[in-house]
């Protein structure tokens, strides 16, 4: 597997020099400075690529080309938005960026309710607290008929939680949910997010999935033409938020996506932390079933609680059998390498706890330096161990 590291460009407090010191050889980045709704200029792509290569690294994955809401709604503005997306994709491919990760989450991107939750090791982790999210949706945002989307017992707990919140706690919860996490959706206000949610009225899961599959039929031929492998990122968390449909959450969703356009360029980002936030997703089985179409891997672990709340655990702890997932991907790599079909799958340590003096530094939520480097070291140890075992198996065969 190719070790990579997410970097948010020149505004990232972590420098490319420090990225190189982690042992990663690839960079995962995007042109976050360019406004959504604008195709990325070829010269800006070339500038970013040159900057990365000057640091002795490679631009291995673009994460992500922004996905305009009109594409997800399939409205009258969608064709122009898809054309802009295709222009950016084409320019990335012609510049030599081999993988593009993207997502299809409506309105909000990856979402957490607490960005500084104390883990058992006293570091700080990201957490999604179900009662807090429902408290925001029902009692702070006051979305129409929001309570109908949740179990009555959960709404009752959320009401109790809301009654205990100070105004400052309510404001912090709102910022955590809608203020825009790194690489995700733009900063929203209470009014703007309510309007965006309302713009999806009447769009159910079947319609949303149809819009995604129509998008794929437009963009995959471009990806094939310029040699880019696409990897759709799962919904995070993989269940409905604000009553909105989410269509990249389960193995059945993946099968629909991959069968819509049968091409190695139409693949997935296997994010174990996102898929793992649903207890009914068997991550090892998914890694085995979809291995040939895994074009990018995010290796992260979560612990899911009885009510669906979850927190980001250490990379080798939590609910995911990380060793089993990595073994499945390494077996796929060796099989396809022998057949000459592709090179190593890029992977990155997805998120990390705030540890040591990172706790007091400016960091992008989830994207600490020490925590991710710790995770990368642990994952590297697993990879090296499994690779040696696979070599022994081959030698004995």
Swiss-Prot record:
Gene3D superfamilies: Divalent-metal-dependent TIM barrel enzymes. GO terms for molecular function: ferrous iron binding; manganese ion binding; mannonate dehydratase activity. GO terms for biological process: D-glucuronate catabolic process. Catalyzes the dehydration of D-mannonate. It catalyses: D-mannonate = 2-dehydro-3-deoxy-D-gluconate + H2O. It comes from Agrobacterium fabrum (strain C58 / ATCC 33970) (Agrobacterium tumefaciens (strain C58)). InterPro entries: Man_deHydtase (IPR004628), Xyl_isomerase-like_sf (IPR036237). NCBIfam families: PRK03906.1, uxuA. Keywords: Iron, Lyase, Manganese. This is Mannonate dehydratase 2. Pathway: Carbohydrate metabolism; pentose and glucuronate interconversion. Its cofactor is Fe(2+); Mn(2+). Belongs to the mannonate dehydratase family. Its EC number is 4.2.1.8.
């Amino acid at each position: 597997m190719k070790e990579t590291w997410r970097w948010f460009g020149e505004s990232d407090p972590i420098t490319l020099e420090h990225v190189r010191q982690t042992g990663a050889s690839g960079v995962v980045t995007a042109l976050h400075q360019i406004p959504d709704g604008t195709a990325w200029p070829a010269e800006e792509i070339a500038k970013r690529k040159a900057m990365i290569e000057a640091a002795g690294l490679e631009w291995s994955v673009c994460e992500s080309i922004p996905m305009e809401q009109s594409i997800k709604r399939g409205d009258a503005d969608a064709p122009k938005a898809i054309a802009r997306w295709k222009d950016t994709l084409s320019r990335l491919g012609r510049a030599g960026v081999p993988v593009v990760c993207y997502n299809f989450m409506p309105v909000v991107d990856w979402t957490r309710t607490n960005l500084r939750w104390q883990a058992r090791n006293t570091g700080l982790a990201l957490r999604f607290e179900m009662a807090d999210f429902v408290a925001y949706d029902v009692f702070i945002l006051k979305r129409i008929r929001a309570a109908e989307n949740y179990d009555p017992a959960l709404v009752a707990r959320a009401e109790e939680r809301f009654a205990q919140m100070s105004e400052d706690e309510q404001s912090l919860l709102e910022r955590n949910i809608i203020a825009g996490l790194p690489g995700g959706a733009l900063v929203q206000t209470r009014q703007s997010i309510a309007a965006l949610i309302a713009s999806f009225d009447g769009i159910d899961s079947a319609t949303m999935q149809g819009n995604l599959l129509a998008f794929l039929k437009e963009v995959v031929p471009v990806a094939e033409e310029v040699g880019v492998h696409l990897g759709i990122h799962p919904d995070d968390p993989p269940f409905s938020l604000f009553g909105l449909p989410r269509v990249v959450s389960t193995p059945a969703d993946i099968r629909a996506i991959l069968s819509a356009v049968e091409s190695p360029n139409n693949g997935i980002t296997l994010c174990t932390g996102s898929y793992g936030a649903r207890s009914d997703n068997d991550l090892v089985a998914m890694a085995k079933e979809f291995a040939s179409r895994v074009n990018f891997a995010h290796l992260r672990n979560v612990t899911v609680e009885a009510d669906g709340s979850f927190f980001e655990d250490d990379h080798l702890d939590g609910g995911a059998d990380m060793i089993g997932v990595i073994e499945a991907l390494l077996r796929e790599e060796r099989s396809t390498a022998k057949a000459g079909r592709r090179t190593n799958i890029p992977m990155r340590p997805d998120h990390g706890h705030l540890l040591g003096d990172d706790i007091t530094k400016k960091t992008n939520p989830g994207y600490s330096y020490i925590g991710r480097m710790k995770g990368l070291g642990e994952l590297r140890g697993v990879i090296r161990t499994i690779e040696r075992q696979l070599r022994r198996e081959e030698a004995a065969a």
